[in-house]
């Protein structure tokens, strides 16, 4: 296992997944402020760090009352959001997992 080289708490809104033209149309021709903020974060932080894994804790995934840690070596499929299906419908995803890291995180589980 390596070390933590960075951490961030980032805001997000489901509309970020809409096409740019749709976002502009919904926001009187202006981009939502989150988009340039995330681009700046990528340039100033993500592109400057030496990392190999990103851990995302998000309240909009399969559960809102607990965190689920999956130890799959790879996950892929099509995602449709329950909150904003018109913006996130059948979005393909394929990403590598890190079973070793997932199991290390799971060791800190609080038993209910």
Regions found by a protein language model. Name each.
Residues 2-111:
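A short aromatic-anchored loop/beta-hairpin motif
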